Amino acid sequence: MRILIVDDSAFMRKLLSDLFTGEKDFVVVDTARNGKEAVEKTKLLQPDLVTLDVEMPIMDGLEALRLIMQETPTPVMMVSSLTKAGADATMRALDLGAVDFIAKTNGPISSIQDIRQEILAKAREAVRVNVRRLTRPQTAPITQRSVLPFGGGVQGTDKIIAIGTSTGGPRALQEIITRLPKNLPCGVLIVQHMPPGFTRSLAERLNSLSDVQVKEAEPNEPIRPGWVYIAPGDHHMRVERNGGQKILRLTQDPLIGGHRPAVDPMFDSVAQTYGKQTVAVLLTGMGHDGAQGMKKIKENHGFTIAEDQSTSVVFGMPKSAIELGVVDRVVPLQAVAAEIIKAVSL
């Protein structure tokens, strides 16, 4: 796999190049110092993957990404700083077609080395992505958004919608959450594999585009109808009963399958607290997080939905649940919101 590394810092170019050195399946074909060089070298070299810094002189990473996706569609993995501005820019990059991102550490070299395997895994997954699927997500115009009718047995927060996703998730979530109506009679819980800070930017972006209220979850917060709660980076999110309420519990328990937040503990907890009132969804993502949790939801007679292969950026997490035989409906991304609304209305 041929990689082009783009960063205005010579130190970061060498650090990232060294990460891939010694891996038999990677070859760093060249490096670039700014977005202009990145666009030119992507055209010339036709790499399998581009790692692209966000903040650069002459042309920044976002403009370079836009041109690359327009002129030479190629899998791109952003390299972002751990700042609010960096997280916001990363959300825009994922919207423009970046496959994934690496959170650039401000610490010692060892900090990058600590996540070496994660970077390599992301890179191996990114090169297999069909970038034609990374067209801009469709945000439903207000006039076309669903209006969920009350009735059909829907009662307050008796039901819960639980969604798990990873690679490609922010774009998939935008497709779904913007189609949920303001009068949604239950809460929505989301686990998106993402570091601290980035989940807040994701929540803010979705909130600005949606009729429902979207926020990063807070400790011991009660679940309210019409609200969407995104698990904060580096925290597992579970549901617990607290008297007559159901509240969100955030913990820093050990990583599960290399993830925190992970989908499985969230799914496990809703299976226990909501049982058959659960509507669970697995979207695009690498690995198998969420499959076992979805199995528990199914065992408790909840309703389960998985995104199909045709629209998944990475068909890993949904595939794992489908292979376990615990999915009621397998549908393309564009049909997921309608399936959710139908299930909540039953």
Model-found features: residue ranges?
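Conserved acid/base catalytic micro-environments in cytosolic active-site loops
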Residues: R2, A10-T21, D25, T31, ...
